Swiss-Prot record:
This is Transcriptional regulator MraZ. Forms oligomers. The gene is mraZ. Residues 5-47, 76-119 form the SpoVT-AbrB domain. GO terms for cellular component: cytoplasm; nucleoid. HAMAP family: MraZ. One of its GO terms (biological process) is negative regulation of DNA-templated transcription initiation. The lineage of its organism: Bacteria, Bacillati, Bacillota, Tissierellia, Tissierellales. It comes from the Bacteria. PANTHER family: TRANSCRIPTIONAL REGULATOR MRAZ. Belongs to the MraZ family. It is found in: Cytoplasm, Nucleoid.
Amino acid sequence: MFINEYFHNIDSKGRVIMPSKFRDEIGEEFYITKGMDECLFVYPVSAFIQMTEKLNKLSLTRRQARAFSRVFFSGASNQEIDKQGRFLIPQSLRSYADIKKEVAIIGVSNRIEIWDKEKWEQYSNDSSLNYDDLADGLNDLDL
């Protein structure tokens, strides 16, 4: 499981260090794709396959399902961690998430999110994201 947040710089080639606590769990190979809220989603191969299976079950006659699948898969990139613990964030994905020099790498259960550091700080400090209010909205999940 991925938890916590880490901050790293991107080098001139678009590479960033995968936090050491995430390396064993993510494995040698993983997928990075467009996420929601202007961030990137990083999935271990097994979680990406599960997501693929779920998306493949959606009806092709639903416009929203087709559109989501297009965005999700067209932005996906298969990546590996090099010997220095780095991986490449392709330019197209850096542009999508408006990633500049520093990133926040966030553990979110079965996936990792990558944010531009400034955007993550704005998001996580947003007063409208009151934790208690968010939890109240999840009453039906019996947490």
